[in-house]
Swiss-Prot record:
PROSITE patterns: SHORT_SCORPION_CHLORIDE (PS51200). Belongs to the short scorpion toxin superfamily. Chloride channel inhibitor family. It comes from Hottentotta tamulus sindicus (Scorpion). Expressed by the venom gland. It is found in: Secreted. This is Chlorotoxin-like peptide Bs 8.
Length: 35
């Protein structure tokens, strides 16, 4: 499960992608990173 995400974090989309295993994967939705 990915860490909580915060839309205020400019690095968040990269963190989401890294957590989800690749570029273009993972979205910051609500407080959670969804893969």
């Amino acid at each position: 499960r990915c860490k909580p995400c915060f839309t205020t974090d400019p690095q968040m989309s990269k963190k989401c992608a890294d957590c989800c295993g690749g570029k273009g994967k993972g979205k910051c939705y609500g407080p959670q990173c969804l893969c």
